A protein has these predicted regions:
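Short amphipathic alpha-helical segments
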Residues: 26, 55-58, 108
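Generic amphipathic alpha-helical segments used as scaffolds and interaction surfaces in large
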Residues: 14, 21, 50, 100-103
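Catalytic core of tubulin tyrosine ligase-like
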Residues: 39-41, 45
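Short, extreme N-terminal leader segments that mark the start of a protein/domain
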Residues: 1-36
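Long, charge-patterned amphipathic alpha-helical coiled-coil/hairpin "stalk" segments used as oligomerization
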Residues: 83-92, 96-140
Length: 140
């Protein structure tokens, strides 16, 4: 397969963010939509590991939740958040994935995370007909 598909995802701009008041009013609907959307972007790897594929919609939601929690209104602070979150949106030449390891029991979590140090070097994604792709971990 030699054909390349390039789909550049839009980056989040200040104009894409809602005011605190508007977000609060729309939050229940937005939250339900994002929960439904995120279900289609998760790949479980076992009982304790999941891949979450990031995109514009997910990152915009995360920024809006941060703005809500921290009551951020100044454009300068908002721009700082955009600078932090926009690199987590795929640019059409890559995937952005959060690898979640979840262990509810604190003692087990500490032990497992110690044992799993470096696991990001052992993971790859392979699509039929293509070579495996290995992550660039902690790029952000």
């Amino acid at each position: 397969m030699n054909s390349e598909v390039k789909i550049a995802m839009k980056k989040i701009a200040l104009a894409d963010l809602l005011s605190l008041e508007a977000y609060e009013a729309q939050r229940p609907v937005i939250r339900q939509a994002i929960m439904d959307h995120k279900k289609t972007r998760r790949v479980p790897l076992g009982p304790n590991a999941t891949l979450h594929f990031e995109d514009y919609m997910v990152m915009r939601y995360q920024i809006m939740e941060l703005i809500r929690a921290e009551k951020i209104t100044a454009d300068e602070e908002l721009e700082g958040e955009l600078e932090a979150y926009n690199p987590l949106i795929p640019d059409g030449k890559n995937l952005k994935v959060t690898f979640m390891l979840e262990y509810p029991d604190e003692a087990e979590r500490k032990e497992r995370l110690r044992q799993l140090t470096g696991i990001e070097e052992l993971i790859s994604i392979r699509i039929a007909g293509y070579d495996p792709v290995y992550p660039i971990a902690n790029e952000d």
